[in-house]
Amino acid sequence: MDTAERLDLVTRHTTEVVTEDELRTLFEESDPSAYIGYAPTGEMHIGHFTTMRKLADFLRAGVDVTVLIADLHAHLDDNKSPFDLLDARSAYYETAIEGMIEAAGADPEDVTFVRGTDFQLDEEYTLEMYRMAAETTISRTQRAASEVVRESESPNLGGLIYPLMQTLDVKALDADIAYGGVDQRGIYMLSREILPDHGGESPICLFAPLLSGLSGGKMSASDEASKVNLTDSPDEVDEKINQAYCPAGEVEENGVLEYLQHLVFPVLDVRGDSFVVERPEEYGGDLTYESYDEVESDFVSGELHPADLKPSAASAISDVIDPVRERLADKDELLAEAYPEKYGAE
C-alpha cells in the first residue's frame, strides 16, 4: 500500500486532519502510531462505535494503535465515575471496544490497551504535569476542555487537570497521531501548542464527527431515545429507529441518515456488501445502494421515503452492532459491577 492509499484510508470519514501535510510526511518517513483515549463513564453506545470503527482503518494502513482507557480522567471530570467503580467500568469499556473493533472487520488482538493508572501515577509523568500546570493559565485550560469536561459556575479542579494530562498522554504513549471525536479538538490544539516545551512533539490530529441524536439535535447520553445502545435487541433498535426524527427530504440533524453515513456504509464497504431498502413492488420494488451519497440523493428527491428507509436502516444498524451485542450478551456480572444502579449488582 503506497502513501496515497494509506493517507486516503486513514483520513476518510473524518471531519478534520491537523495537518494533512504532516500526516503525509509521517507516512513517507515512518510507520506511525496512533492513540485514542476514552474515559470509562457511562455505557458505550453507537455514537462511540462511529469513532472506534476508524481504528480498523488505522490498522489496515499499518498504523500501530493504542486505546487508552482513561480511568483517572473519568473521576477527574466532575466525578462522573466514582473511584470505586473505575476498575469495573474500565473492564467493561475494554470488552465493548474489542467488540466494536471486531465488528468493524479488524482483530482486537492487534490493538494495545492501556489504562491511565498504568502510567499516570509515575513520578516522571507527575512532575511534568506540575511543570505544565505552572506554565498554563486557567482560562487556557478551560477553553481547551470546554467541549469535553462538565462545566459549572464553580468548576472542580479536576476539570483543569484533565486537559493537561490528556496532553501528557500523547507523549507518554509515544503517539504520532491523536485521534478522537471533534469535541476533543480544543484539548489537542492545546497539546500541539505546549507539548514541544515539555519534551514531546506536536501530535497530528484526526477528528471524527459527532452524531446527531435520533430525536434531533445533539445525542444525549441521558436520553435513551436519542441513541442506540450496544446491548439493544433487534426489536429495541427497530423501535428507536421507527420513532426517530427523519422528516422526508431533510438531511440536517437526521440521525438515521448519519448512522448510515458514518457507521453502516463504512462497515458494508469493508464487507463488500450493499445497502438494500425493501419496498413492495407496487411502490417501485427494492432499492440497492452502493454508497451513502446515493441514499441521500434519493431521500432528498423524494424517491426514498422515511417509511421505507427506517425498517431497512434499523436492520442494517442491528446487523452492524450484532458482534458487540454478542460479546456483551454473557457479561451480566460485568455490567452489574460497572453500573450497579442500572443492572443491580448482587
UniProtKB/Swiss-Prot annotation:
Signal peptide positions on this chain: none
- One example GO MF annotation: tyrosine-tRNA ligase activity
Example of a GO cellular component annotation carried by this entry: cytoplasm
Keyword Aminoacyl-tRNA synthetase part of the UniProt annotation: yes
**Key words of the record:** Aminoacyl-tRNA synthetase, ATP-binding, Cytoplasm, Ligase, Nucleotide-binding, Protein biosynthesis
What is the annotated localization of this protein?
Cytoplasm
> Sorted alphabetically, which SUPFAM superfamilies does this protein's record hold?
Nucleotidylyl transferase (SSF52374)
Motif 'HIGH' region: chain residues: 40-48
The entry's L-tyrosine-binding residues are 35, 162, 166, 169, 184
For the keyword Ligase, the answer is: yes
Q: Which GO terms describe its biological process?
A: tyrosyl-tRNA aminoacylation
Q: Disulphide bridges in this chain?
A: none
Instruction: Give the top-rank taxon of the lineage listed in the UniProt record for this protein.
Output: Archaea
Enzyme Commission (EC) number: 6.1.1.1
Pfam families in the cross-refs: tRNA-synt_1b (PF00579)
Q: Give me the reactions it catalyses.
A: tRNA(Tyr) + L-tyrosine + ATP = L-tyrosyl-tRNA(Tyr) + AMP + diphosphate + H(+)
Q: What does this protein do?
A: Catalyzes the attachment of tyrosine to tRNA(Tyr) in a two-step reaction: tyrosine is first activated by ATP to form Tyr-AMP and then transferred to the acceptor end of tRNA(Tyr).
Q: Which HAMAP family match?
A: Tyr_tRNA_synth_type3 (MF_02008)
Q: Member of which family?
A: Belongs to the class-I aminoacyl-tRNA synthetase family. TyrS type 3 subfamily.
Subunit annotation: Homodimer.
Q: Which PANTHER family match?
A: TYROSINE--TRNA LIGASE, CYTOPLASMIC, TYROSINE-TRNA LIGASE
| Protein name, entry field | Tyrosine--tRNA ligase
What gene is this protein translated from? tyrS
